[in-house]
């Protein structure tokens, strides 16, 4: 209240910033006549002078902004026949300053982006424009290409089906690169899994503009980018677990919490499951896989809905993006959940995967020197943008005032009554020819409406995840006279819905929302499809107490209001009090999701520091100039000191107390080198360390002396990389499992995040040692045929090369399965877990206490 009052008196921060931007815009406008008078060649020459002044170090990008924007606007007018409005110039300045420009639908964000893109491309370090799908990346990149090329810049577009690293590298080396968030992120991960510099495609992270920034940095931030490969988990029991899950009774055998998305087995449920599985203890080590798979089967059946969370498409379970309604082809749920869904739907159960490399969008985009974004809906998440990304949100006024009418919500008691009212409204509007766009929250609801409209013989088009390939055309035509369009979660963002004068006379595009989304931004995006660039239009939401949001989060208060007002069946209430109650429920969910995203980024920040260290060293290994032999010599000395510590030989100790027999037995076991303790009995610690290190080095040098230096270096480099990748993969497993269980420490009055940081530091120290020492051990024991060592070395190098090429091509890693001689024998905490996850028992099913189905999203 006080803040709002102060804003009215002194003006808000947003108002003050807009005032500053308008002063810069005036300077740009003052140059318009100057550049308009120039010929094309003279305009290009003027721009080249600006480029030279920046590249020579004489001027900064900020100092040439006014001239660059003025020239870009003039070039756009000539080449694209599109002139930037003043508000678009403001948007461009906001983006250049590394902020978020909130601009309403239809305000021309694609054209706005050209201003900061051109300015920042001058540096020669590359500019990335990120969009939500290939269609928009290709459309925007190619539509703006003539402008960029007129000003002397090269343009590239990264597409999902682009696999050739040579072609991709050329695209990334362009001055300006358009692409999707997924492709940029996955290319970064693939680069850091590559075994040669030739297969790496990205060249750095200078400046990025994220289109639909709220969708990418907020909505998709809960889902990390993951590259995965196969595990050795058996696929048996998924079908049996599904059958058993269906036999268990809700509330008696397990409880479901939709709000927190958890399924918990009760004591009765555990007993019943043991009877059905015919085992004595569901949580004993030998049954570890059964308890895990049953948990996933329960989630699949009671938390995940077909045509809401996923669809079955051509015999495959495909995830539906909850924010866009699009199919997420290629993505799979982890931890066996996808297999559980496949068992539920009776389709082929595919092999489970393990994480090979991952990164969150938060940490990927924070790598850029400068990050900016644009969207029509950002203010509701302004605090999150500021706290996580250090991004300010600037709301930019529309070029023409908005004439759209946003009517109050209509709330019915039941979903049936609500849909009857929606159909009546559609029939009424359709009869007049006024176009209607109906927004639904799921594929299931869009199919219900589709069937009813078919019965009513009302011509219409459906846009959901099942036909998203045509979304651009469907959305584009949604403003035509008489058009009735059903769209799930407002897929088709980035495509304008234009209306002609005849439609404007009928009242413009009418938006009908059939359900409030958990997030207000999604609702605002739906509203924003109508009334673009000063067009008229109307929006209204039809709700019921049976809607997911109201049922889970807010229906009690609203229900009591309806009862007090005496609302009869078929009647609705239209009240600001109720609308506020709905928004309060939405804020509750938004806050819950924000805490989830904050939780993810806090934990991933820990992993991210480790990731940066590992990837930095990995890139050093790939550098042909990196002296790998010197590095091997360094870690060999560390390895010998490590062996000393293992047998309690320490600096300052008495040499007579050195247990050389134990030391040399360990050396023989680890690197197959025979040594006589009597030959070393007279050495003090430092001498012993130096002599033994030299002895091990001499043994290695003698073996490798038959090879030329380049082959030696190649083998050392390939083996080091292989050990690094293998250890990093297992480290990701350990970190992921530790993160899952660390929350329990809160019960012991300990901060889980602090504990996670401590534990992860210890794990990382172990990781670094494992990589170094395993590399030394492998290099020491590797042998070549005596007849032709050069040929054998080439064969080894070629084998390594083939393996890494397979890794790069299919992201598949060799894995070995070991059968336990006796499944019921006692399992050591450091043994591999019998559930087949590939993790140590102590980090998987051996964690204290039975797992009872806590949902892992």
UniProtKB/Swiss-Prot annotation:
The gene is secA. One of its GO terms (biological process) is protein transport by the Sec complex. InterPro entries: Helicase_ATP-bd, Helicase_C-like, P-loop_NTPase, SEC_C_motif, SecA, SecA_DEAD, SecA_motor_DEAD, SecA_preprotein_X-link_dom. GO terms for cellular component: cell envelope Sec protein transport complex; cytosol; plasma membrane. May bind 1 zinc ion per subunit. It holds the Pfam family SEC-C. Monomer and homodimer. Part of the essential Sec protein translocation apparatus which comprises SecA, SecYEG and auxiliary proteins SecDF-YajC and YidC. Its cofactor is Zn(2+). One of its GO terms (molecular function) is metal ion binding. Its main location: membrane. NCBIfam families: PRK09200.1, PRK12904.1, secA. Gene3D superfamilies: Helical scaffold and wing domains of SecA, P-loop containing nucleotide triphosphate hydrolases, SecA, preprotein cross-linking domain. This is Protein translocase subunit SecA. Keywords: ATP-binding, Cell inner membrane, Cell membrane, Cytoplasm, Membrane, Metal-binding, Nucleotide-binding, Protein transport, Translocase, Translocation, Transport, Zinc. It comes from Sulfurimonas denitrificans (strain ATCC 33889 / DSM 1251). Zn(2+) binds at residues 833, 835, 844-845. Belongs to the SecA family. ATP binds at residues 88, 106-110, 496.
């Amino acid at each position: 209240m006080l803040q709002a009052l102060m804003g009215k008196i002194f003006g808000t921060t947003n108002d003050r910033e807009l005032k500053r931007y308008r002063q810069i815009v005036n300077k740009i406008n003052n140059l318009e006549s100057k550049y308009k008078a120039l010929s094309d060649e003279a305009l290009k020459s003027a721009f080249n002078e600006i480029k030279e002044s920046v590249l020579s170090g004489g001027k900064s990008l900020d100092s040439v902004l006014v001239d660059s924007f003025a020239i870009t606007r003039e070039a756009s007018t000539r080449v694209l026949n599109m002139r930037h409005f003043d508000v678009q110039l403001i948007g461009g300045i906001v983006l250049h300053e590394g902020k978020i420009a909130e601009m309403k639908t239809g305000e021309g964000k694609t054209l706005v982006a050209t201003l900061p893109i051109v300015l920042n491309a001058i540096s020669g370090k590359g500019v990335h424009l990120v969009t939500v799908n290939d269609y928009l990346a290709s459309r925007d990149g190619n539509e703006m290409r003539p402008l960029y090329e007129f000003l002397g810049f090269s343009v590239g577009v990264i597409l999902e089906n682009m696999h050739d690293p040579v072609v991709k590298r050329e695209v990334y080396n362009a001055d300006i690169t358009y692409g999707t968030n997924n492709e940029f992120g996955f290319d970064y991960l693939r680069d850091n899994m590559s075994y040669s510099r030739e297969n790496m495609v990205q060249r750095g992270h200078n400046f990025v503009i994220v289109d639909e920034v709220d969708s990418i940095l907020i909505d998709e931030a809960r889902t990390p980018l993951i590259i995965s490969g196969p595990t050795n988990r058996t696929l048996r029991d998924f079908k049996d677990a599904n059958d058993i899950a269906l036999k268990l009774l809700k509330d008696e055998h397990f409880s479901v919490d939709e709000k927190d998305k958890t399924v918990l087995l009760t004591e009765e449920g555990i007993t019943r499951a043991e009877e059905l599985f015919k085992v004595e203890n569901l949580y004993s080590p030998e049954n570890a896989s059964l308890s895990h798979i049953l948990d996933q089967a329960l989630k699949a059946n009671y938390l995940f809905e077909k045509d809401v969370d996923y669809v079955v498409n051509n015999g495959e379970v495909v995830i539906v993006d909850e924010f866009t309604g699009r199919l997420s082809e290629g993505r799979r749920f982890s931890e066996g959940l996808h297999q559980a869904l496949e068992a539920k739907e009776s389709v082929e159960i595919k092999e489970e995967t393990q994480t090979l490399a991952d990164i969150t969008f938060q940490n990927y985009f924070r790598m850029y020197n400068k990050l900016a974004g644009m969207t029509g809906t950002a203010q509701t998440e302004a605090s999150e943008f500021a706290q996580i990304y250090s991004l300010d949100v600037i709301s930019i006024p529309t070029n023409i005032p908005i004439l759209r009418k946003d009517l109050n919500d209509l709330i019915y008691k039941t979903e049936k009554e609500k849909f009857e009212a929606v159909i009546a409204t559609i029939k009424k509007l359709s009869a007049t020819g006024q176009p209607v766009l109906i927004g639904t929250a799921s594929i299931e609801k869009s199919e219900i409406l589709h069937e009813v409209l078919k019965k009513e013989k009302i011509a219409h088009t459906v846009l959901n995840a099942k036909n998203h390939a045509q979304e651009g055309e469907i959305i584009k035509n949604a403003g035509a006279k008489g058009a009735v369009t059903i769209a799930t979660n407002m897929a088709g963002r980035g495509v304008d819905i234009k209306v002609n004068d005849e439609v404007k006379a009928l009242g413009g595009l009418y938006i009908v929302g059939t359900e409030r989304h958990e997030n207000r931004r999604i609702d605002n995006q739906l509203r924003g499809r109508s009334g673009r660039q000063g067009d008229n239009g109307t929006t209204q939401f039809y709700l019921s107490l049976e809607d997911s949001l109201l049922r889970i989060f807010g229906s009690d208060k609203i229900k009591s209001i309806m009862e007090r007002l005496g609302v009869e069946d078929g009647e609705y209430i239209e009240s600001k009090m109720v609308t506020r109650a709905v928004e309060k429920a939405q804020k509750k969910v938004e806050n819950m999701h924000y805490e989830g995203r904050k939780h993810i980024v806090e934990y991933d920040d820990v992993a991210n520091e480790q990731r940066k260290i590992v990837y930095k060293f990995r890139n050093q290994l790939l550098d042909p100039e990196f002296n790998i032999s010197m590095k091997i010599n360094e870690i060999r000395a560390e390895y010998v000191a490590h062996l000393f510590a293992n047998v309690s030989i320490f600096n300052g100790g008495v040499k007579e107390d050195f247990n050389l027999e134990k030391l040399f037995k360990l050396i023989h076991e680890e690197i197959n080198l025979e040594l006589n303790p009597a030959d070393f009995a007279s050495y003090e610690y430092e001498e012993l360390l130096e002599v033994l290190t030299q002895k091990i080095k001499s043994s290695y040098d003698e073996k490798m002396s038959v090879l030329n230096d380049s082959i030696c270096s190649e083998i050392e480099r390939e083996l080091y990389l292989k050990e690094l990748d293998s250890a990093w993969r297992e480290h990701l497993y350990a970190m992921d499992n530790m993160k899952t269980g660390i929350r329990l420490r809160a019960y012991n009055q300990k901060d889980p995040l602090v504990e996670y940081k401590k534990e992860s530091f210890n794990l990382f120290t172990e990781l670094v040692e494992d990589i170094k020492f395993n590399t030394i051990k492998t290099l020491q024991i590797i042998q070549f045929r005596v007849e032709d060592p050069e040929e054998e070395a080439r064969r080894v190098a070629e084998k390594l090369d083939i393996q890494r090429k397979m890794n790069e091509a299919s992201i598949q890693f060799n894995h070995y399965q070991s059968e336990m001689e006796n499944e019921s024998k006692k399992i050591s905490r450091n043994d591999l877990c019998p559930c087949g996850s590939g993790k140590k028992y102590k980090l998987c099913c051996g964690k204290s206490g039975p797992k009872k189905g806590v949902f892992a999203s």
